[in-house]
Amino acid sequence: MQQITLSKPVSCYGIGVHSGKRTQLTIEPAKENTGIIFIRTDISSENNYIEAKYFNVSDTLLSTTISNSNKIQVSTIEHIMAALWGCGIDNAVIKIDGPEVPIMDGSSKPFVFMIECAGKKLQNAPKKYLKILKEVTATHKDCELTCTPSDHMKIDLTIDFNSKAIGRQNLVFSKQESFNNNIADARTFGFTKDGDYLQSKGLALGVSFENTIAIDDQDKVLNPDGLRYQDEFVRHKLLDLFGDLYTSGNNIVSSINGYKTSHALNNELLQRIFSDNTSHKFVTASEI
């Protein structure tokens, strides 16, 4: 199994769901072993690039933000990271002229479409996998995320909200190739009761029915077109998990169980994995 990049650059425009700012984003091909790198083209500093790695995650409030040593940052990276993972892209440079990845329709599907339009290119280096060797767990209150050794990827995710519109939902997923058709178009969601508070804090300034599932005080979905799936909420949480875990830099080979996960918990699991050298190793496909 070889590493993969894009065949050519591909671009989009959109607004940030939290900043409300309009940005242009371009995904470009990158050399073998580059990984995923973001470059802030609106900043002239030589240090305007940020590796999309777990150790660069600087904020996990409502989304995942990465920063470099100059405190230059890019926020809400999880949806495009999930798309890159789902499409099997190992190496890419993402150029963006603002602080936040466009929210598009609130899912990963537009980014998947962009990558499919650009095409994929096989590279002359083997794809590397992160194989888990022993159980690692991250917890916060009643929330938990655990990875255990396995010869293939399998995720069992449960969410539980005190909302009749969502409630308790469970999803088991094990085929990366089915991500684009079954998970990628699941949208982000939020509660109208939180809107004023979030906007007073400079968040959710770009929210609309076009990019967010809105749930009102009566636990009703307000979007005119309703849901794309009955369990769209857990599908989106799984999407977020894939995007966050891809900041490991590799596909993870493990059985993963999650309960009420969050961006913070997803990153904490990676921090725990990489803080223990005996918990993992990097392998090629033939070594899995």
Swiss-Prot record:
Cited Pfam families: LpxC (PF03331)
Positions annotated as active site in the UniProt record: 263
Matching Gene3D superfamilies: lpxc deacetylase, domain 1, lpxc deacetylase, domain 2
A GO molecular-function annotation: metal ion binding
Enzyme class: hydrolase
HAMAP family: LpxC
Entry's family note: Belongs to the LpxC family.
Descriptive protein name: UDP-3-O-acyl-N-acetylglucosamine deacetylase
Gene: lpxC
